[in-house]
């Protein structure tokens, strides 16, 4: 090892890579007939880190590390309550997708096509949460896009390539990582065609967007502006291949049950036919019978439906499921609020009758699991406002009267119980 300092009688040594002399660098390390300086070593380490990050995507998705469908399902169970069939369908589809990516380099006569996913279910049934959990489990870049904000290129609004730009932003513009990420497109049903017949006028937020999405979903080279840039003609773009990006599209598809029912009732005619009345059939049961022709009649173009071969339907969450959602998942709402209260050194108890009241209120509002937080937040608002200034409170108890707005939380002091807001 040669130090920066050296006598004039010594032969001057140079880095074999950058050409700097030993006096221009801090350290010069000698090898067999070559030298390398500390600056070149730092540069090498940076290159290795960048390449390792890109290779890490492939390494994390190698066969040995890729969780099996059962393992994927087990992890989904920790965060998502109910929707058992949808979780099984998703687990198999995601496993097959990343297994396919692993075998892309192998030459084979059989080419495996991509299994993009369509999730159909009411608001608050867990569509977005399922997609988020999958991305976190697989450690891949993930982005949520709202289909209602998209328009055809050239019109006011976001064009579909903005989705890929957001995906790049989420992985610090590492193209290799982005090309193996997951894109969740929400409200896909809101860009359905306005009628069964192709329109003679431009439908820039409906069928036009579906056509633009089609190219992205099936695989294309998307041109994305550089980091922090906006699109303009004289600009170099980042090229992102969307062929191996997994697209998950979700929507409530209000009215699809009627389309399915109309079709099934037409076929269920005859002496031996057993036709249930509309009242007897559960909405989730009807949705499970969805066929491509139903989605076409609803307003999706056939080409886009063909690129979403895996269809998973989610049912409405009942009272029991909503109560479980409040307490069972790893990041359950009750656990979150208990942690917030624990930061004030106060124990929070939400009684079973209160949980039931929260679930019933969410069902009345038709908000599903999505509405649970606002109900609890509203019930706890006053006590969370007062708690930091109250002295000696050790526990807060919430019952059904608090949830319904007919009572106030019970505060347990170190000495005696007291109702919040009372003097």
Swiss-Prot record:
InterPro entries for this protein: AAA+_ATPase, ATP-dep_Clp_protease_ClpX, ATPase_AAA_core, Clp_ATPase_C, Clp_protease_ATP-bd_su_ClpX, ClpX_bact, P-loop_NTPase, Znf_CppX_C4
Binding-site positions, ATP: 122-129
Stretches assigned to the ClpX-type ZB domain: 3-56
SUPFAM superfamilies, alphabetized: Glucocorticoid receptor-like (DNA-binding domain), P-loop containing nucleoside triphosphate hydrolases
GO biological process: cell division; proteolysis involved in protein catabolic process
Residue positions binding Zn(2+): 15, 18, 37, 40
Pfam family, one: zf-C4_ClpX
Annotated disulfide bonds: none
Keyword Cell division recorded: no
Cellular component terms (Gene Ontology): HslUV protease complex
Source organism, top-level taxon: Bacteria
Subunit structure: Component of the ClpX-ClpP complex. Forms a hexameric ring that, in the presence of ATP, binds to fourteen ClpP subunits assembled into a disk-like structure with a central cavity, resembling the structure of eukaryotic proteasomes.
Family statement: Belongs to the ClpX chaperone family.
Protein name, as recorded: ATP-dependent Clp protease ATP-binding subunit ClpX
Organism: Burkholderia pseudomallei (strain K96243)
Lineage per the UniProt record: Bacteria, Pseudomonadati, Pseudomonadota, Betaproteobacteria, Burkholderiales
The encoding gene: clpX
């Amino acid at each position: 090892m040669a130090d920066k300092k050296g006598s004039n009688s010594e032969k001057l040594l140079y880095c074999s890579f950058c050409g700097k002399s030993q006096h221009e660098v801090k350290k010069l390390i000698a090898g067999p007939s070559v030298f390398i300086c500390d600056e070149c070593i730092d540069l090498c380490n940076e290159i290795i880190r960048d390449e390792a990050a890109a290779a890490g995507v492939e390494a994390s998705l190698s066969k040995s590390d890729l969780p099996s469908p059962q393992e994927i399902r087990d992890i989904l169970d920790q965060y998502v309550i109910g929707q058992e069939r949808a979780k099984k369908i998703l687990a198999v589809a995601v496993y097959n997708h990343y297994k396919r990516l692993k075998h892309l380099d192998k030459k084979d006569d059989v080419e495996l096509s991509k299994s993009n996913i369509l999730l159909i279910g009411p608001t608050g049934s867990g569509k977005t949460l399922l997609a988020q959990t999958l991305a976190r489990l697989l450690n891949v870049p993930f982005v949520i896009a709202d289909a209602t904000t998209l328009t055809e290129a050239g019109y006011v609004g976001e064009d579909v390539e903005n989705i890929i730009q957001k995906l790049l932003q989420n992985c610090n513009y590492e193209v290799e990582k982005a090309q193996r990420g997951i894109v969740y497109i929400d409200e896909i049903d809101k860009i359905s065609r306005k009628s069964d017949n192709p329109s003679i006028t431009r439908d820039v937020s409906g069928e036009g967007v579906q056509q633009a999405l089609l190219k992205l979903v099936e695989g294309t080279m998307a041109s994305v502006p550089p980091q922090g840039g906006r699109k303009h003609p004289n600009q170099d773009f980042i090229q992102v291949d969307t062929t191996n990006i997994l697209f998950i599209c979700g929507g409530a598809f209000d009215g699809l049950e009627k389309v399915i029912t109309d079709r099934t009732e037409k076929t269920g005619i005859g002496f031996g036919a057993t036709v249930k009345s509309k009242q007897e059939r559960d909405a989730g049961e009807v949705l499970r019978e969805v066929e491509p022709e139903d989605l076409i009649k609803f307003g999706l173009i056939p080409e886009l439906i063909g690129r979403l071969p895996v269809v998973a339907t989610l049912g409405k969450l009942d009272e029991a499921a909503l109560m479980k959602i409040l307490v069972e998942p790893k990041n359950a709402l009750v656990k979150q609020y208990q942690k917030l209260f624990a930061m004030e050194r106060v124990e929070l108890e939400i009684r079973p009758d209160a949980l039931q009241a929260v679930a019933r209120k969410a069902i009345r509002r038709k908000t599903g699991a999505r509405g649970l937080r606002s109900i609890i937040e509203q019930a706890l608002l006053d006590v969370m406002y007062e708690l930091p200034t109250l002295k000696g409170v050790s526990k807060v108890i919430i019952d059904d009267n608090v949830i319904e707005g007919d009572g106030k939380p019970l505060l347990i002091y170190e000495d005696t119980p007291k109702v919040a807001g009372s003097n």
